[in-house]
Amino acid sequence: QLEDNPPPIVSAMGVTDGNATELPIFVRGNHNTPAKTKQPRRFPQVLSDGKPLAGEASGRLALARWIADEKNPLTARVMVNRVWRWHFGRGLVATTDNFGLLGDKPSHPELLDWLAAWFMDNGWSVKKLNTLILSSATYQMSTTASPSALKADANNVLLSRAPLRRLEAEPLRDSLLALGGLLDKQVGGFVWTFENYKLVFNHTSEDATTYESNRRALYLPVIRNHVYDLFELFDFPDPGTVNGNRADSTIAPQALYLMNSPLVLRATESIAKALLKEDELNNAQRVQRLYAQV
C-alpha cells in the first residue's frame, strides 16, 4: 500500500548556473553585425577598471558583491530609507523607489548618509537598524504639535513631531483577530494544506484560494490574480509591481467592509462573549472595558 501511495515529494524552486560564454560587441548596436572578436564579461570599462570575470563564473556572485560593496553606498542609502519609511510613513527621500535625478531630494541628507554608513558598519543588519530607529528620540516623540511647528512645518517633513498613521491592511486584520482572542500566534509552518499548483486557475475556473485562517497576516500567501479582499480595500500594493510607497485612501467600501465583513463580525462576537462572561461588571463597566480594550 505504501508503494502504491507514496507520500508527496517536497519540492522547491531553485536556481542553477548555466554555461557562461563570452559575447561579441554589436557594431553600432545592431545584433546582426557582431564584431569579429568576443569580449570578456566585466563591468563596463567606461565606468570601472575592474578585472574581467572568471571564465566559468555566471557573474551573479560578482554582481551581488558590486551591489553590496562599501564603495557603493547607494544600496545602503536606499535600504535605510525604506526602513525609515516603514516606521514613519514617509522616507527621508519621499520617492522611495526613485533615488535618481527625477526623485525628491532628501529632507535630512546628513542623517541619511550617517544611517547608511552605520548600517554597513553593523553588518547590514535590518534588525539592528530597526532597534536603532525605534529607540531614537525622533521615533518616540508625541504626535502633539505646537502652533509654531504647524505653521513652519505643516506636513511634518522636518519631523518636529511623531506622524499620525493609519493602520495598514495586515496589522488591521491581525488587530481584529487579536482583540477577539482569535489570533493564532504560531511561528512558522503553512497556512494551507493543499499543493501550490491548486492556486493556479484551471480550465474549469476552480479556485482553491481561501483566507479563512487565524494565522498572522505575515503567513497569508499573496496570489497575484486573487488578492485577499481586505488587502485590496485597504491599499495593499499591486503584487505584480514594485511599490515602496503604499497609497492611503479613504473610500466608502472600507466602511462597508468594517460593518459587514464576516471577519469583523466574528471578531466582535468573540469580544462580546468574553465581556458577557465577566459577571462582576455591569453594562456601563462593560462599555468602558470595551472602549479601553479596543
Residue ranges and their predicted role:
Residues 216-222:
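Short beta-strand/turn segments that mark the catalytic/cofactor-handling region
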Residues 223-227, 235-236:
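Short Ser/Thr-interspersed hydrophobic loop/turn segments at strand-loop and sheet-helix junctions
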Residues 1-214, 231, 237-246, 259-294:
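Primarily short, surface-exposed interaction patches in extracytoplasmic proteins
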Residues 251:
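Active-site-adjacent segment of 2-oxoglutarate/Fe(II) JmjC oxygenases
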